[in-house]
Amino acid sequence: MTKQEAMERFSSGAVQQSLEIHRGIQWTGRIVGLLVCVLIVKYLPSDWAERILYYLLLLLILWTLHRLGESQAFICEKGLVLKRRPFSVKEYFHSLFHGDEYFVFVDYEHIIGFTEGWRELQAMNGHGGIYVIPLDLAQVGYKDKMAMIEAINKHSNL
């Protein structure tokens, strides 16, 4: 999901910042992935059936490398747009092809906080109940996490 899509899909106001996986993790993943791709091409078997499997593996790795730079969250004027973690294996495979459907908007005034490992967001609904949104923000950079906390603190003190 892009910044423009986040603004159009949710009534979140202007997007102030996009959060991605830490750059070091992205580059490490890309280097390792490309090395594996080179090894796959170098040791490609001569049997056509095995060759098809190797090509499918190669496509899967390249697709995964492409997805490393996708946004995990957006800091907006009115709240956070977060990519929630799938609940089941079926949802996981659905999220590979329809990742934009897993973004949710949470208003700043409803946010209670994040769990210690950045795996869940705890928020309060309109009736006073608490709900938990599973997230994958553990690999987001420290500065981006602190920017998210600053935005929550800034808007919750109003």
Which ranges hold each PLM region?
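A membrane-cytosol interface segment of integral membrane proteins
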Residues: Q122-L158
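N-terminal membrane-targeting/pre-transmembrane regions
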Residues: M1-K42
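Generic detection of short hydrophobic beta-strand segments and adjacent strand-loop junctions
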Residues: S12, Q17, I21, F103-V106, ...
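Short, surface-exposed beta-strand/loop "edge" segments at domain boundaries and coil↔beta transitions
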Residues: T28, L82, F87-E91, G128-I133
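Acidic, Ser/Thr-rich low-complexity segments on the non-lumenal side of membrane proteins
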Residues: V89-H127
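Hydrophobic alpha-helical transmembrane segments
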Residues: T28-G29, V41-L58
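Generic detector of contiguous secondary-structure segments
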Residues: Q17-Q26, L58-C76, T115-E116
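Conserved beta-hairpin
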Residues: I61-F105
